[in-house]
């Protein structure tokens, strides 16, 4: 074996070990957590769904805004759409893996969704942006409830 082959094998082993450790760690953390009431699981599942809907709505609205141009591509508006899409996906991921920090993520997500909704509502008469605002408000409401858990 040459030195490069040994190095490559070591890197592969470390990468697979880190992935396996993360899975074992996540499984261990989940197993150690106290059982949540069934209603908590349903609420969390609903919140994940709302986060995924808001993520998609923001990304689709961003595409629409980029195609429309003009005031629709104001940097502050584009940043909020991106921020909202990303925090919604991250928050859904926190809940899906049973993170103990999901309430923190949900609180932040609710705040960003509200800001995004206000930014979208500023474009009065635009049905695409109004729909995005509605979706973000629904997500914000669901996340506020989960943040209390």
Model-derived features: positions:
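N-terminal secretory signal peptides and thylakoid transit peptides that target proteins
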Residues: 1-18
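Membrane-interfacial loop-to-transmembrane-helix junctions in polytopic alpha-helical membrane proteins
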Residues: 7, 41-44, 71
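Amphipathic/hydrophobic helical signal segments and adjacent flexible N-terminal regions
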Residues: 15, 20-27
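C-terminal segment of N-terminal export signals and the immediately downstream linker at the start
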Residues: 25-59
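Extended, low-complexity, charged alpha-helical tracts
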Residues: 50, 62-138
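Residue-level hotspots at or immediately adjacent to binding/recognition sites across diverse folds
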Residues: 148
């Amino acid at each position: 074996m040459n030195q490069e082959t040994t190095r490559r094998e070591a890197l592969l082993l470390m990468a697979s070990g880190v992935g396996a450790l993360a899975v074992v760690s996540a499984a261990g953390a989940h197993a150690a957590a106290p059982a949540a009431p069934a209603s908590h699981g349903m609420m969390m599942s609903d919140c994940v769904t709302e986060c995924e809907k808001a993520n998609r709505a923001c990304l689709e609205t961003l595409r629409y805004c980029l195609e429309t141009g003009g005031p629709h591509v104001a940097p502050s508006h584009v940043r909020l759409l991106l921020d909202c899409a990303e925090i919604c996906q991250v928050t859904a991921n926190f809940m899906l893996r049973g993170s103990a920090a999901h309430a923190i993520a949900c609180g932040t997500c609710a705040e960003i969704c509200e800001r995004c909704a206000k930014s979208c509502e500023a474009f009065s008469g635009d049905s695409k942006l109004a729909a995005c605002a509605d979706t973000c408000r629904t997500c914000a409401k669901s996340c506020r409830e989960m943040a209390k858990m």
